[in-house]
Amino acid sequence: MGEMHWIIRHTQRLQWHRLLPLCLCLIVFMLHAPFSTLSAQESQTAYNFLRLPVSAHAAALGGDNISLVDDDATLIFQNPALINDVSDRTINLNFMTYMEGAKTASAAFLKAAGERGTWGVTAQYMDYGSMKETTADNQELGTFSARDIAIGGTFAYALTNELSGGVTAKFITSYIGSYNSLAVGVDLGLNYYHEDYDLSVSAVARNLGGQFKAYNDDFDRIPLDLQIGATKRIGQSPLRVSATMSRLNDWSEGFGRHFAIGADVLLGQSIYVAAGYNFRRASEMKISDAEGSSAHGAGLSLGAGLSLERFKLHVAYAKYHVSASSILINISYAL
């Protein structure tokens, strides 16, 4: 019996050593951002709808969370490595109000692939509504519409009992009036989860790739985002805290603006309430007037969720634009 136990442990150690170089290469690749993106700002990238959170639970925790381990299909949009804990054959629908006249919707379907794998397909759509079309001297020519679409496929695999990896490949297109652009992007994710300590640590590289068809002669970057994050339950209490650092490929701004923090309180097995704060969003939406400057609540997010055996409902409130507040709703059902 002791000899068999030694063989099992030795085999697991050999498997880990075979996987370790792959994991280290992925981490090094993520931490060494392309030099061309070091000073890239949001205004210099296209398809910025990909920066918006899709998961209401992640949105409530500050918007950038990549380390939440839960039976929540929307986490496929935050970190592809997180979907191994999602129920088999889960279908998910999401809707969010954005600024006036703009709406965004998304959907996902996830299915188990063997004992250690999970695959999923996703779709995201953003409609900016109708806008006035004018000449250079402000003469009205009519109206035009704009919309963005992304379609993706994801595969995640449990490398060990604690470590999972995932990859999402996506096709992205955008329409502005009669103009159209096309791009491809890849998300890479790692998650380490220690069940005994209820500790989750993740690293994600989002939107690796670029345009292959521009609106005109000038090609735009897609919004590359390197992120690290952790989530920890405090002892046996119902309190769970999270911290995420995003845009680690862009250090042209202050250190503190890279952080989003959040906490959720688990009210039994089925209900949670959550709150978070995003320092970048608060800074970007700060407005100055005669009385000083204020973010007017931007940066703060709130949310709650109900998780039953087959049905999940999550709702979050936040501000992603200076002109309006946003409500994000997720509905999931395991078939």
Kindly label every feature range from the protein language model.
Residues 1-5, 24-27, 263:
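Low-complexity, intrinsically disordered short peptide segments enriched in small/polar/basic residues
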Residues 12, 19-24, 57:
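A periodicity- and composition-biased signal for non-globular, repetitive helical segments
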Residues 35-40:
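Sec/Tat signal peptide C-region and signal peptidase I cleavage site
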Residues 1-17:
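N-terminal secretory signal peptides that target proteins for export/translocation
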Residues 21-34:
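Bacterial N-terminal signal peptides
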Residues 41-335:
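Subset of outer-membrane beta-barrel
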